[in-house]
Amino acid sequence: MGSLSNYALLQLTLTAFLTILVQPQHLLAPVFRTLSILTNQSNCWLCEHLDNAEQPELVFVPASASTWWTYSGQWMYERVWYPQAEVQNHSTSSYRKVTWHWEASMEAQGLSFAQVRLLEGNFSLCVENKNGSGPFLGNIPKQYCNQILWFDSTDGTFMPSIDVTNESRNDDDDTSVCLGTRQCSWFAGCTNRTWNSSAVPLIGLPNTQDYKWVDRNSGLTWSGNDTCLYSCQNQTKGLLYQLFRNLFCSYGLTEAHGKWRCADASITNDKGHDGHRTPTWWLTGSNLTLSVNNSGLFFLCGNGVYKGFPPKWSGRCGLGYLVPSLTRYLTLNASQITNLRSFIHKVTPHRCTQGDTDNPPLYCNPKDNSTIRALFPSLGTYDLEKAILNISKAMEQEFSATKQTLEAHQSKVSSLASASRKDHVLDIPTTQRQTACGTVGKQCCLYINYSEEIKSNIQRLHEASENLKNVPLLDWQGIFAKVGDWFRSWGYVLLIVLFCLFIFVLIYVRVFRKSRRSLNSQPLNLALSPQQSAQLLVSETSCQVSNRAMKGLTTHQYDTSLL
């Protein structure tokens, strides 16, 4: 039972550790990365405005007028078929017949999924329907529309508003719409025509009864009170033509223009859910919904953002793209980021020195030297000093690696402020890893880094830490240096000197006695050459003669004295 509880505790500990170790990205990080790629931004701060609920503020970027003719939408239907789950009858071992239920799509209901307060410039073209009996989507104020096409429900034609310069720029139903414009030049021209907010206006002659409007991109013309929008050659595939069909069929004007019908071949080829063929009766009038799903395009009507036009809709709408309200900063002062908790202190400039990074206490078993160190406390001081020095060098390398990147984006590292408890807690590395956003006013800021500076510094830090282990265990310099550990006090010096002197005296006495005894016990053997031997023999003979003479002289003198 105890082992089982220990195992459960280990699992909980590992789970908690992994939870702390793995830091999820901020929810806005993927959006910021996508926008930075589209706009070719790197090594900068992207900030997005947040409201009180921390929801991102959206900006609507108007599309060019040519988008109405170059892009085609998708047909959807007011009701969508959904098959119910099949239920098996266990008594008969058979399945019930598949039943279907109907659901109205969000587009068909005319429901918006977002609200917009900012526009990036004006719309080059707005489309208006005044007399629709279906959902009211909202009206874009006329001052934000360079040109307006409104649908005439009496004859089923689009009519251009030729007197936009003389008519009132404000309608009664525009007072509830609050829109503002801004210019973000760093967005324009950076998206390969994905976000092209330059206006392509229609050219008109507003002072004549018979007027003619020409669009330079598509060649569509309006002449007098009639329009060839539905009959112009090669102009029956664009979004504007599909919108005309969406409105025309909603008013039941199928017989107004001869042979043209709402339920033509191009629509009957569409299929419903799960490849089920669409019944023909869906296509007769009010069940068509024009959608721009999965295209990146949206419709803005008033403040509401829509993905499609429901049948019989009314309002004044424009076409464009939906993006977060972003602000770009090349650098951010530390005082601008109000929710930084950590403090970064200045680090001593790095000195380019070469040296070992081994820490002997990590590799030498301290148990082997515990007894000796108890007798001689100073033993091992060199190892400790070297370890402390190497740790200091490693810390200096780490600070130097991060300092270069941080100083490039932080001009005043000494002015970092602490965050209040209500704000998100973060520091510069978490902001750059995009795990938390830095608060600048009411904006959420993330750092966009595509030069891989931070990752390269992290790699260098990893290599520096690995160098602490990749060192030779045998260091001759360290061996000689360890001798210095014995000379940490004069007491040890005197003890070592006396000990060495005593050993020297013992060795000297023993060696001297042994050498003297050897000299006395060994005979003298001389090695002489023949000449030296002859000379020595002559000398010996002379000495014998001399000795004999002296002996005889002595005997003679002795005899004389006796007489």
UniProtKB/Swiss-Prot annotation:
N-glycosylated. It comes from the Eukaryota. The chain crosses the membrane at residues 489-509. GO terms for cellular component: extracellular region; plasma membrane. Residues 27-488 are extracellular. Glycans are attached at N122, N192. The keyword Glycoprotein applies. This is Endogenous retroviral envelope protein HEMO. It comes from Homo sapiens (Human).
